[in-house]
């Protein structure tokens, strides 16, 4: 069953993997969630012009036993949201907005996407990923486009606390590195959409060579998750014009920073010493 209070976010994370008829149902629910809590199965099916069996299958696809359980959980979520549905609309940038208003809207957008990420994350899987990373001989982060930039940022942070880590955004380098991984290594694939062919193929190669594989994505059932041992789902709550800079990067960085914090937790002294050691060699090169 989907996490309580998380029905709408779960639908969003599964959206790209849904069939055409399921997307039709999802669109209506995301647009008018109150419809489900106020109507019966037959009434909703008639409104959507789909069969009752199709609606029940949709509920099972997103993790519920049937329509009744789905309706109950969605009703609970709506009752506790306190009109939070308005928050996404309030982050849209309008032509009349001044710089302060835009700044406040971006602040709200960041808060929205982090809240959604916390709701979507399977924290047990996250903790397992941290355990695997602590034991890993090497860690490789793979991602193209903006996800590649995020991978480089994570590489920098992990290297500073003593991990053997690398990152790549070039597909040829990604494939070659993945082919050389072993069962002692961990491969992390970053793809917000989940449909990056290069990243999905890299994770497949890494898996075939025995590495532990992790996918960080917004799309729970997507190509990048197919060969992943662990799937970490990030949020995507953003306005139409906010794009990757707010939605994708903030959500991905939030998850990676959470992993970093858990890796350091309980080993603060060792992490601090290692970080200072790596910092010192950088400071030595600065112009005095």
Swiss-Prot record:
<keyword id="KW-0805">Transcription regulation</keyword>
<dbReference type="InterPro" id="IPR047640">
    <property type="entry name" value="RpiR-like"/>
</dbReference>
<dbReference type="Pfam" id="PF01380">
    <property type="entry name" value="SIS"/>
</dbReference>
<dbReference type="GO" id="GO:0006355">
    <property type="term" value="P:regulation of DNA-templated transcription"/>
</dbReference>
<dbReference type="Pfam" id="PF01418">
    <property type="entry name" value="HTH_6"/>
</dbReference>
<dbReference type="InterPro" id="IPR009057">
    <property type="entry name" value="Homeodomain-like_sf"/>
</dbReference>
<keyword id="KW-0238">DNA-binding</keyword>
<keyword id="KW-0804">Transcription</keyword>
<feature type="domain" description="SIS">
    <location>
        <begin position="129"/>
        <end position="269"/>
    </location>
</feature>
<dbReference type="InterPro" id="IPR001347">
    <property type="entry name" value="SIS_dom"/>
</dbReference>
<dbReference type="InterPro" id="IPR046348">
    <property type="entry name" value="SIS_dom_sf"/>
</dbReference>
<dbReference type="GO" id="GO:0003700">
    <property type="term" value="F:DNA-binding transcription factor activity"/>
</dbReference>
<dbReference type="GO" id="GO:0003677">
    <property type="term" value="F:DNA binding"/>
</dbReference>
<dbReference type="InterPro" id="IPR036388">
    <property type="entry name" value="WH-like_DNA-bd_sf"/>
</dbReference>
<dbReference type="GO" id="GO:0097367">
    <property type="term" value="F:carbohydrate derivative binding"/>
</dbReference>
<protein>
    <recommendedName>
        <fullName>Uncharacterized HTH-type transcriptional regulator HI_0143</fullName>
    </recommendedName>
</protein>
<feature type="DNA-binding region" description="H-T-H motif">
    <location>
        <begin position="41"/>
        <end position="60"/>
    </location>
</feature>
<dbReference type="InterPro" id="IPR035472">
    <property type="entry name" value="RpiR-like_SIS"/>
</dbReference>
<dbReference type="InterPro" id="IPR000281">
    <property type="entry name" value="HTH_RpiR"/>
</dbReference>
<feature type="domain" description="HTH rpiR-type">
    <location>
        <begin position="5"/>
        <end position="81"/>
    </location>
</feature>
<dbReference type="GO" id="GO:1901135">
    <property type="term" value="P:carbohydrate derivative metabolic process"/>
</dbReference>
């Amino acid at each position: 069953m989907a996490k309580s209070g998380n029905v709408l976010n779960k639908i969003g994370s599964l959206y790209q993997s849904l069939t055409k008829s399921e997307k039709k149902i999802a669109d209506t629910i995301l647009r008018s969630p109150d419809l489900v809590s106020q109507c019966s199965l037959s009434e909703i099916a008639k409104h959507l012009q789909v069969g009752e069996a199709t609606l029940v299958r949709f509920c099972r696809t997103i993790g519920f036993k049937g329509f009744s359980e789905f309706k109950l959980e969605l009703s609970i979520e709506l009752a506790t949201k306190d009109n939070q549905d308005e928050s996404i609309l309030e982050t849209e940038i309008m032509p009349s907005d001044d710089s302060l208003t835009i700044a406040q809207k971006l602040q709200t957008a960041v808060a929205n996407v982090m809240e959604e990420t916390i709701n979507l994350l399977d924290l047990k899987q996250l903790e397992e990923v941290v355990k695997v990373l602590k034991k890993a001989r090497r860690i490789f982060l793979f991602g193209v486009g903006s996800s590649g930039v995020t991978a480089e940022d994570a590489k920098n942070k992990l290297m500073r606390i003593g991990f053997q880590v690398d990152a790549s955004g070039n597909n040829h380098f990604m494939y070659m590195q993945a082919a050389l991984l072993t069962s002692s290594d961990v491969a992390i694939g970053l793809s917000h959409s989940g449909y990056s062919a290069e990243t999905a193929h890299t994770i497949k190669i890494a898996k075939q060579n025995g590495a532990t594989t992790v996918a960080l994505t917004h799309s729970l059932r997507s190509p990048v998750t197919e060969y992943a041992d662990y799937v970490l789902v990030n949020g995507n709550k953003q306005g139409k014009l906010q794009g990757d800079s707010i939605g994708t990067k903030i959500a991905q960085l939030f998850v990676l920073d959470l992993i970093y914090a858990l890796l350091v937790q309980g080993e603060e002294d060792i992490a601090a010493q290692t970080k200072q050691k790596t910092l010192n060699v950088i400071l030595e090169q600065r112009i005095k």
